[in-house]
Amino acid sequence: MELAIKDASGGLEVSEATFGREFNEALVHQVVVAYAAGARQGTRAQKTRSEVSGGGKKPWAQKGTGRARAGTIRSPIWRSGGVSFAAKPQDHSQKVNRKMYRGAIKSILSELVRQERLIVVESFALAAPKTKELVAKLKELELKDVLIVTEEVDENLFLSARNLYKVDTRDVAGIDPVSLIAFDKVLITAAAVKQLEEALA
């Protein structure tokens, strides 16, 4: 299959297995959820009644005071007591094998092509880190909410885009399923398309 190049005549020949496959919503959902789960810190920690300091001595006699019986001042029903079902640090990561992950990326790319949200350009670079220049370039292409993908890290592009709302830059190695679906359009260079195709082959 062929992808049209926005700023050049002709097109770019790409693999149908990468850019023309059927959209697998269940797979994409599973991979995105797993990716988001892996980003969780999972460091929350509370203390149970046995972990809170103090509370070793019985506060008052079992009988004869007229008060409710109590064995420790660190009971979960007491102020400053332990927590009944205390949260503990845990690993939220989910296993996603390589084939599934690549399948999800291909599925997303194919859907972007179908919806005409993947815009291929011959090259996209700035001579200096100028946000104004980048805004002008994006305006020319009628893009606002966009992920810019280049074949390698472009320092000028990164510095120019970091203060712009709904604009992000990535190199091919930095692409993930969440970033691909988070933006309205994906602007990608022809060299990055070929590099991405090789990585997903």
Swiss-Prot record:
SUPFAM superfamilies: Ribosomal protein L4 (SSF52166). Residues 43-71 are annotated as: Disordered. Pfam families: Ribosomal_L4. GO terms for molecular function: rRNA binding; structural constituent of ribosome. Keywords: Ribonucleoprotein, Ribosomal protein, RNA-binding, rRNA-binding. InterPro entries: Ribosomal_uL4 (IPR002136), Ribosomal_uL4-like (IPR013005), Ribosomal_uL4_dom_sf (IPR023574). Belongs to the universal ribosomal protein uL4 family. Part of the 50S ribosomal subunit. This is Large ribosomal subunit protein uL4. It comes from Pseudoalteromonas translucida (strain TAC 125). The gene is rplD.
